[in-house]
Structure formats: C-alpha cells, structure tokens
C-alpha cells in the first residue's frame, strides 16, 4: 500500500528491483494503474491502461477466461472477455471496494483477516447497503448498538459487496463461464470469494499471482529498455507543480489563533470535585453512532465526571465500567436520576435500568440552552450524523438531519486522517496554519479521494489538505444539509456542538463562512450526555432505577438472533439478555415483538391500503393466466387492471410481496445502479412471475396518469412511465414469454377500448372490441370505487384520531411507498409513537387546484402539494414526506412541499428511503418532530 505516497513507494520498489533482481542498469519498464498515467507522462515512461494489462495477463496465464471480477482499493471492475471485450467499472462510488471493506473492518474494530475468519462462522445475513461506507455504517452501527454478532455482520458485509458489484457493474449482463477473481480483497478474503460464488451460483477461480495481474500484463507488453537510475530520478521529481486551487489561510498568524482560542475557552461549564461531593447526582448518557459519552452532574449542573470513548460496536461494557468506577471510588455520590439518548438509547436503558430516554435533538437543545439561553440555532456534527435545528419561542421549530451522506461529519475527516496515516487529533491541528488550504468543494468522500490525491501530486502539503477538508465539512453542512440561502437565515445566537467542532479548524471555517461569532462550549463533544443529565435533573423523584453495585458486578450480556413472524416485515431480531432478568429486542421495525399488540386498533392508512390491494385474488378464467408485476404504478392501478383482465376471462396473477430475496433474484439484470430502489425491485417481480411459469405478462408503458385536476398536467415520472422498456431490453428470461409493454393511455377513456383491442389482438385471438369495451367499463368503475374507498376510510380515520386526541401524520409519497420492503415499516413506527397515519391520496382530493411556485405536471406530485396545503390550518395534522433516494423529480417536490408547509408555520420532515433497512435515524427524526409538536 502506498498511503498516497506514490513516488516514495515506487522509487523504493524500483531500487529494490535494481538491487535484488536485475542487477543491471536497464529493463523493459511499463507503467500501469490509476496513478500511473500522470507518472508515465511526466517521467516519459511507457504506459498501458490497466484493463488491457489485466486482459493480456488473463489470456496468457488462464486461457479461456470468460469474465474477470477485480476489486481494488477504490475501484471495482468486471471484464467480459468472451464475445468481444467489454469493461464495466465503478464511476462515482467506491462502495464494495477494498477501501470500503477497510472502513467496515475499522468500524467492527477487527483486522481484515479476523473479519474473514468471523464471516466463516455466520448464522444470519443482514441487509447492508454497500454503495459507500456511509450507507453501510447507517446499517451496521445500529446493528452493533443492538448487540448483533460480528460474525453475522462480517458475512453480511461480504454479501453486500458481492451484490453491489453484480448489480452495479454487471448491469444486466450475465456473469457465467470461467470467472477469475483478482485484486487484494478477493485474494485475501476467502469468505468474500464465497459470497460471490453464492450470489453468482458459480465456482470462481483465484489464479496464482492474482494480486499482480495488472503488473504482469504490463510486463508482458514491455518493448522498450529503460535506464532504471534515470527512471528513479524522474519519479522523485514527479508531481510537485504547485498548481492546485487554494483558498486563504484560516489564520494569518499565531496571535490571531490565540485570540480565537481565548474567546472560545471563555464558554466553560462549571466543574465540581467529585471526590468531595456528597448527595444527589444526575447521570446523562449519549450512546452515539461511533462513540459513547457519559457525564455525572451535581445539583446545580456542575460537571463532576465524564467519559468519552469509541464504542467499538458495543456501548454496554463502557457504561458498565463507568458506573462501577463511580460506585467503587465515590460511595457518597448517589445517582438520583438518569437519562440516555442516541442510537443506543433503548439498549442501554434496558441493560442498566436507566430512568428516562430522551430524543437526541431535545438533549442537545437542553444543553445548548444552558450555555446560551437565547439560542436560536443549534448545529451538532457527530461521527456520521449531523443535527441542526432552529429555535423559535423557546421550542424546536425546524430540524435538519443529513439524510444519506456523512461527508460533512466527523467520520469523513477521520477516514481521511487514517488514510494519510494520522490520528484525527493530530490531523485536525495540522490545518490551522496551512499556507494554501486546498479548495476541495463539498463533495463526498469517494469523489474527494481523487481530488486529494491530485492535490498531493501537485505539491499540496498534508497541512493544506487538512485545512481544505475542514472547509469542505462546513460547506457541506451549510449548503447541502441546512441549504441556507444566507448566513442570516441560520440565526444570530448559534451554538455549535459535537466532537467535530472540537476541531478548531472546522470551527474557524464555520465562523468565517457565516460571518458571525458562535458559541462552542468547552464540552462540545459531551453536549448530548450533558443535556440528558440536565433532563434527568428535571425529572428526578429522588430515587433512580439504575442498577446498583452488587447487580453490576454480576452483570452479564448475552445475544441471540431470530426472525420475527408477527407481520409482513419479517424483521431479523437481535435479542439482548441481561443477567437473565431484563432483555431488549432490537432490529424490529414495529412494536409487535416488544408489546405483542395486534395492531388492529391502529389508525394506519398504509396498512389498510396494502390489505385492500392484497384482497384482489386471481379468478380462474377461460383465457388462462396473465401476470402483473406488483410494483411502481401497479400499487395504484391494480384495481383497474385486475377488473379489466378478469372481465376478459384472464386469471390475473400478481407477483408476490417484495422481499430482499425477490430483489436479489432480479438484481443481475438491473442495468443502472442510479435508478431508484422501487424501480430496481421490478426486475425481481418480473423474475418471480417467470419463475412461476406465467407465459403472459402485462406491464404497459404509460406517459400519462389520470387527470385529477390538481396540476398543470398529469404525467407519470419518466421511470414509472417507461420502465417496461428497460425490463424488456435487459431481462433475457422474458425471451420465452409474451411480455406486453405497449404504450397505453388510461386517461383517454373514450379511446382506451379501441387501443387495447389492437394491443391484445397482437397476442391473443378472439378478443372483440365489445368485450374490451365492457371490460374497460368494469375497470374504470373498479378504480373509482377503490379511490372512493381510500378517501372515505381516510376521512373516517381522521375523525377517529381527532376523537381520541391523537396526532395525525400524513405520510406522503408515491403509491408504491406502500410496499413494506420500500417503506421499511415507517408507517408502523409512526403508529408505535402514538399517531395516526393517513396517506396523501386520502386528503389531496379535499383541495382545489392552487398556485405553486414550480411547474406542477406530475399526478403523484400534485397530490403531495395538495396534501401539504390541506394540513396547513389543521393543528393536529402534520406531514412527513417519503423520498426514494435517487429520485430526480423529488429534488423539486421536496423544496415546494417545504415551502407550502412553512408558509403555514408547519414543520417539514423528510425521510429518504432505499435499500437501507435500519430505522435508527428515522426514529430520531420522527421523535424530534413529536417533541417539537409537544412544545
């Protein structure tokens, strides 16, 4: 590994080769690899592109190779050699590469070889996103916090890498024949190779010298004798051009830094001497994504003791040791009340009998208020999450969380520090006095890797890079997460907190960017725990339920894993047992396994609609079976098509409910990883129908939807409208089927029978216009009845919720967000928090067309705007918008829905959903919303 010190490593290797191998002054030298082109051009050395080098080595060393799968440090490649060479490479994302696996091993706190050994002993595979380290952390960290075994997580990471490579790179082309595995990860990790074998249903080949195929191919292509000494001299001079984009230094001189430091050191928490303290104390714990923080405060909020540690995937032993140290060393201190916040809240609450749980945003606000009573904006940047909230009239008014990317968070900086061989504490200080901070923009870790490397090649120092990364963190927070139009939009009394703001460079950039002086408490990294302790102080009854010394000394923590069968989510549950008495169930997406409630009394339109659609059963017909893939717009139009084809004498067979297994069945035919998850699922649904032996499958292209008179037009989005074309072009399994995907316009009611008669006439004999006209009448009637049912039931649930005094959440998205595999049970999470769930189509009909600030031309999106408008004057109703990651149109809808809500002083809450199944961050967002509403 070169750790970005390319020239040093390369010259060292060449000197070793010269000394130990060739003995002479010259050799046929050819350069290859992603960093090789610049070196070859500057140093006038022969270059061969690495893909060609790999293919040449494969043809020479393993004749008859059909496919090569190669995973490197930051790149992944699939080379199809049979039938003409075709190359598939990762573009913008390094998910599923060596760097990704390294990040995951760091997260698990195990060496790579141990991770491989752990994976061989797995029992369960969890769903983990492998697109980038950030997404995977979103899945893995909560699993660790819930007590899942590292054996299962390790195997799940390898399975995710295999699935990511196949779905993201093969792009629909089958991987078969003689398949070679190359590159470091596939060479060193036997369980990763096994994951590929299982996913592809093959036995891949790991050839001898699999690490060196690019170098071997380059050697086989050598034609020119190069003087090694000259090459070494040229490489040593390579790269220092000084030509990189830079920005002004953070501090002009050390005096300016000292003034800055003194100003911020004035905001200090009062401290007490725990060794002499007697009486009631209050415990606050913040179980974050990567760290655990705990504080003990006195009766006046003075800080008596604290701990701040990386949780290494399990916060339980850290809190156990902390409590024991207090009991053993300070017997006069009595814990009168305790509170816990963060990802590991429920785990620690159940493990140690902690009195209260508090949502993170409220904990941080409570602490911020203690230091600056008139605070109007709080920003907290942690390891992989960012929380910002505006305060109005002493209550949280608006919340911003990073949805899908942690490029503005602490783990982003830590990853770079580790990559460059520094501890994060040392790396952070390097940038303070950088002469020319590199301008890196505000992009994600993967994009920035290449920019950092290029800047290094151009002569940027590590100091310049450290400062540049601090700038990018702040810009990402302000312009990507908060999306502030100006500095004034944030507020005048800003409190910053979280471990990342302990970095003086980040703090300086933040103040410079906003042009304001902010408050950073000296316990910036402990604010969540401190806020929890203050909250506990306010809730104290004098006696805490935290377990005592004797029970703590005999404390044991055991973990079991099982599948839940109480609802269609089939969650993989992690059962934590503490000392045989208490237990905590993690991994559940609803409350059924915890409370054993049936859910029959819950007011949930999502469940109601899903059950309604599942009630459409096949009716045997003379014309045989016809399959409909149950996804995308079929979640809206199933009643229409079911009535239509049943009337024509077809037995309508609908594909099964989505599941991870169904997705995996179709993933090899997905041609692009950028399409939204609901569209990706369609491949699995079509495959399921084919596997069932259905020979006629109906999935039409539909440019237009029904016109509900709410917008300027009534299109379907391009993915919904034309995805049948993608299915037809990429799924070879349809070769033996009659796949009907003609263009249909159900909005043209009078024209529809004639069009459908022509379409069906191409595939079936004997279908008359009269039959189709009759079927069309049945279809439109069934659809109207379905809509009437939804609207009526929605009204009924709203009235019942009002009668019970419940909060009502209009969970707004697309019809296909009903799919439990897509929404991950968010509707049930909301009902478990005591609110009713209404869908947007149940209320959008109650609004007449109104002016919007955007072109309103999509039927489903018009409903979103109408739902936002409808709840504007309803005090007990609020809206939560579901957004599928990768949805281009929602870049527009989210801003417009936010605008409509904020015009009516409503809080806008957005939840981005895709393959990631863990709802830790979602729960924080929803609980924050409810906490704000209570105020």
Predicted regions and their residues:
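A mobile "lid/hinge" subdomain adjacent to the ATP/sugar-phosphate binding pocket shared
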Residues: 119-152, 163, 431-464
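An N-terminal assembly and electron-transfer interface module characteristic of large anaerobic redox
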Residues: 90, 94-101, 300, 405-413, ...
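Glycine-rich phosphate-binding/hydrolytic loop that grips phosphoryl groups
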Residues: 98-103, 207-241, 366, 410-415, ...
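Phosphate/ATP-binding catalytic cores across multiple sugar-kinase/actin-like superfamilies
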Residues: 16, 20, 153-177, 218, ...
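Gly/Thr-rich phosphate-binding beta-strand-loop-beta motif of the actin/hexokinase/Hsp70
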Residues: 1, 65-82, 272-304, 375-392, ...
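Glycine-rich phosphate-binding loop plus the immediately following alpha-helix
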Residues: 3-4, 83-124, 210-214, 220-224, ...
